[in-house]
Amino acid sequence: MQPDLSPQLAMVLNYIRHFIDINGYPPSIRDICKATGLRSSSTVYNYLNKLEEKGYIRRDPSRSRAIEILTPYPALTRAKNMVSVPLLGKITAGQPILAFENIEDVFPLPADLAGAENAFMLHVSGDSMIEAGILDGDYLIVRPQDTAENGDIVVALLEDEATVKYFYRYPDHIELVPANSSMQPLIVHKVTILGKVVGLYRHFS
């Protein structure tokens, strides 16, 4: 991420770059709203103004779709098979997963690794999934979906807290099972599924 940009601005800039590389022309305001989850066109205009003030883009107010990228960027982020994946912080019940206030950073990842253009990443805290090879400090790549099959590793929301567990549905209850033999399953009757874990990124220090 560019050091002088917030995660939100970086995500908008990366989306514009990606859209231009794929289509050969800039996105519309509506395109940016849809891709980033922003509901207000005025908010998009505000972000574009900030990017222009910082020298990242140039716009022609007399023409629509007139956004020009001014700053160079690594070939990796320009590749047509790359997607910008947001790293989320706290996930709150009743709030869209990709709400901009949840985004801590943005990472360019190969589309095959991300699994979906709307994928997101979460930072793992704890050792409840160590026997599945998911360690404290790892970054999980998650495909948003609200359903799951038995045996899927999911991100679920329980009482305003996100948890990563194996998912199993039974006739009278749901079990969220840790991959740690020292821990017990969580037995619930209702749960909100936020997504399925489709990949993992680990940094070796």
From Swiss-Prot:
Keywords: Autocatalytic cleavage, DNA damage, DNA repair, DNA replication, DNA-binding, Hydrolase, Repressor, SOS response, Transcription, Transcription regulation. GO terms for biological process: DNA repair; DNA replication; negative regulation of DNA-templated transcription; proteolysis; SOS response. The active site is at 128 (for autocatalytic cleavage activity), 165 (for autocatalytic cleavage activity). Residues 29-49 bind DNA. GO terms for molecular function: DNA binding; serine-type endopeptidase activity. The keyword DNA damage applies. It comes from the Bacteria. InterPro entries: LexA, LexA-like, LexA/Signal_pep-like_sf, LexA_DNA-bd_dom, LexA_repressor, Peptidase_S24_LexA, Peptidase_S24_S26A/B/C, WH-like_DNA-bd_sf. The record marks 93-94 as: Cleavage. Its EC number is 3.4.21.88. Pfam families: LexA_DNA_bind, Peptidase_S24. It catalyses: Hydrolysis of Ala-|-Gly bond in repressor LexA. Represses a number of genes involved in the response to DNA damage (SOS response), including recA and lexA. In the presence of single-stranded DNA, RecA interacts with LexA causing an autocatalytic cleavage which disrupts the DNA-binding part of LexA, leading to derepression of the SOS regulon and eventually DNA repair. Homodimer. Belongs to the peptidase S24 family. This is LexA repressor. It comes from Moorella thermoacetica (strain ATCC 39073 / JCM 9320). The gene is lexA.
